[in-house]
Swiss-Prot record:
Name this polypeptide is given: Adenylosuccinate synthetase
GO cellular component terms attached to this protein's record: cytoplasm
PANTHER family listed in its UniProt record: ADENYLOSUCCINATE SYNTHETASE
Chain positions recorded as GTP binding sites: 11-17, 39-41, 311, 337-339, 419-421
Any one GO molecular-function label of the UniProt entry: magnesium ion binding
Residues reported in the UniProt entry to bind substrate: V305, T306, T307, G308, R309, K310, R311
Class of enzymatic activity (EC top level): ligase
Keyword hit for Phosphoprotein: no
Length: 432
């Protein structure tokens, strides 16, 4: 059985908290896409754990964790993250972590050229805007993957005669093409290669044929939870291109990033922030560049875990949610951070887009059109009540229930969980 947790907006919805809540019921937690450009925080027994690349199932000592073939791995960051978790009391994480032999490696020069590429794109952009990359080398690594010149984990850990020499030769060719593309930037390949000789031995015990690993687990009745990274609106195909990440962040990325058949996927949980946020540039129809937006940002503590950047804030956009639900096929929803709306007297919700008075039937793929939409709002009454101490769904204020019911009715998907505060236990559940 495979269940999936996916972000429905532009990321930072609180996926990790739901995974943390569910992980005790699963044998394996897997990631299928992205790298250390993701970021979420989990609080367990008062200890805060920051996750970027690693599956958050590591907080459960009885759970195995998998980085699938669709993930791109910056090896130094992987070990740094493992060390940080160990220092905070999570033991034997390296023994509970398995890494796909097919996953591609992010080198330091990928990160360096990521920033150069950002400057280049800004220079040719009509409005001079950045894509908003995290600078972690994710895009350049997926680029070399697509051009069939990248290096995978199995290239690094192979012990056959001549394998290291082949790895080194491919590495140098890859670096040479980067320098031809971006100029002779300052870089020490010998230092990086020496580091990878050491990483090779440390990585080897964790590396598996992930396609066999996960399908064998399915065949043996293991329960698997897939932890999506980023969110649908950052998907390379379905997001607000080019202000997106470089991988498939929706349900398609689960299939291609793990090698799992669609027929094995059971539940798909869509995580939805009760309002909308976005990090970096790109269109954001319901953004509030006013006191309301600042209030959402302040109360919601909207700063990125990975970048530290302020998140842009706006009202819940049900056009976005309906679009992502259509693609990902959510079976139920988790509404997060509902408590951030506690003090708002009125809460507008975006329900449709129009251009020049003409209502749009679908989410615009063209950013010029998207940047010119007028949003139709329905304004719902607030509840003006602290909900952070509430422990049962039925105890929510009537207007909070009406807000949730409006969402359910609009998208036609039941809400199974509601987040009412930052604490681990601040999550209401109801049977759907």
């Amino acid at each position: 059985m495979v269940n999936v947790v996916l972000g429905s907006q532009w990321g930072d919805e609180g996926k990790g908290k739901l995974v943390d809540l569910l992980v005790g019921k699963y044998d394996i937690v897997a990631r299928c896409a992205g790298g250390n450009n993701a970021g979420h925080t989990i609080v367990v027994n008062g200890i805060k754990y920051d996750f970027h690349m690693l599956p958050s199932g590591l907080v459960n000592p009885n759970c195995s964790n998998l980085l699938g073939n669709g993930v791109v791995i910056h090896v130094p960051s992987l070990f740094s993250e493992l060390n940080n978790l160990s220092e905070k009391g999570l033991k034997d994480c390296d023994k509970r972590l398995f890494i796909s032999s097919r996953a591609h490696i992010v080198f330091d020069f990928h990160q360096h050229t990521d920033k150069l590429r950002e400057l280049e794109l800004k220079g040719i952009s009509k409005d001079g805007k950045n894509i908003g990359t995290t600078g972690k080398g994710i895009g350049p690594t997926y680029s070399t993957k697509a051009s069939r010149s990248g290096l995978r984990v199995h290239h690094l850990v192979n012990d056959q005669p001549g394998a290291w020499e082949e790895f080194e030769a491919k590495y140098r060719r890859l670096l040479k093409t980067r320098r031809e593309r971006y100029g002779d930037f300052e870089y020490d390949p010998e230092e990086e290669l020496n580091r990878y000789k050491k990483y090779k031995e440390l990585l080897k015990p964790m590396v598996v044929d992930s396609v066999f690993f996960i399908n064998n687990a399915i065949a043996n009745g293991k329960k698997i939870l897939v932890e999506g990274a980023n969110a649908l609106m950052l998907d390379i195909d379905f997001g607000t291109y080019p202000f997106v990440t470089s991988s498939s962040t929706g349900i398609g990325g689960v299939i291609t990033g793990l090698g799992v058949s669609p027929r094995h996927i059971n539940e798909v949980y869509g995580v939805v922030k009760a309002y909308t946020t976005r990090v970096g540039e790109g269109p954001f129809p319901t953004e509030q560049l006013n006191e309301q937006g600042e209030k959402l940002q302040t109360i919601g503590a909207e700063f990125g875990v990975t970048t530290g950047r302020k998140r842009r804030c706006g009202w819940l956009d049900l056009v976005v949610l309906k679009y992502s639900a259509m693609i990902n096929g959510y079976t139920s929803l988790n509404i997060t951070k509902l408590d951030v709306l506690d003090t708002f007297k009125e809460i507008p919700v975006g329900v449709s887009y129009s251009i020049n008075g003409k209502k749009l039937d679908s989410f615009p793929e063209d950013l010029i059109n998207l940047g010119n939409v007028d949003v139709e709002y329905v304004t719902l009454p607030g509840w003006d009540q602290d909900i952070t101490k509430i422990t049962e769904f039925d105890q929510l204020p009537e207007n909070a229930k009406k807000y949730l019911k409006f969402i359910e009715d609009f998208v036609g998907i039941p809400i199974e969980w509601v987040g009412t505060g930052p604490a681990r236990e601040s999550m209401l559940h109801r049977d759907v």
